[in-house]
Amino acid sequence: DARFCATTASMCGVEKAGFEQDAAAMDKAIQLDVMLHAYMFTQSGIPVIYSGDEIGQVNDYTYKNDPTKAHDSRYIHRGAMRWDLAANADDADTVEGKIFQRLSELEKIRRSEKVFMTNADMWTVETYDSSVLCIGRYYEGEKMFGLFNFSEYDKTAWINETDGMYKNMLTGEVRKAAGVDIP
């Protein structure tokens, strides 16, 4: 079986960090999970959040107990929605709440900013680091850069855009788009 199957949260380390009760690893796993969804939100088209991804639902191994499914690893991320965990979505102190609230914020930004229109221009920007991706979007006078750190270490994106000041859509910070630190 050459497939790569798992929930987003499990691929990002949420499952492992929870099993090991490692708070620092959990914070990094949540950051990676949210970053991957942010990357998805910068793409054109309709972003699709798979059932359970909005709360960081981890792999469901119970498929192995069903002889009709045990041979197909895709069932690992097709488990039933964990409504008991979804009940934690409003609690910012839980994994589910941290992920749900941050994805909700990304969704709100995507809906409200015209730079995410389907017919916006989209391109990549050189970051001088193969583990850092920068995606630019432009629509009707608005420009946005999305920075994505695929490294396990904090990085600085050397994108050196010199055409003005930019506002971080998540924090509201206004700054130049040059030498941007990203976790």
Kindly give the residue locations of the regions a language model identified.
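Active-site and adjacent substrate-binding regions of carbohydrate-active enzymes
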Residues: 1-183
